[in-house]
Amino acid sequence: LILSGDHIYKMDYEVMLDFHKANKADVTIACMPVPIEEASRFGIMVTDDIGRITEFEEKPEHPSSNLASMGIYIFSWPALKEALMSLKDQNSCDFGKHVLPYCKEKGERLFAYEYNGYWKDVGTLGSYWEANMELIDIIPEFNLYEEFWKIYTKGDIIPPQYISADAVTDRCLIGEGAEIYGEIHNSVIGPNVVIGKGSVIRGSIIMRNA
């Protein structure tokens, strides 16, 4: 199982693994439909009726499909080992640009596992900001407080946030240890941040300790 580190989603990998085994796949790629105008930002694939990948192209200028790779892969060890050993002398070895096309050319069984939940690539400042703003929606699509699938993070021993009587807050996430004396609207405030009296914060992400 190979994952990207700049994506936000919730997925039960065991279900994807069962799909991989059931299809006797050498490679399974998690994928989801994206707007066709954004497809050139992703690895794009075309599949047959049973989900086997017939075409794969990394970030094509003129995409033939809108089925995009999520950067989540399950490989059988023999297929991955052969690909990496064969490509080891290259200056670079990217999964989308080199490993997956190599496996496809070798005739390996590549399958697409379609995912229908929330997924966000936060590899740019713009997408990182968008993902944080989505967390403060009235009903967020990606819910940090979902009863049966909570998100647990490192616990710091710091006091709870303090919001003064004169402060104004509206649709915000405020981290522990933060002190709020000003106005905050539609923003995410990290731990140990101090928002001084007279300050007005709108549509922003303030990182910890600021």
Segments the model singles out, each with a brief description of its role:
Residues 1-135:
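Unchanged
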Residues 78, 85-210:
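Left-handed beta-helix
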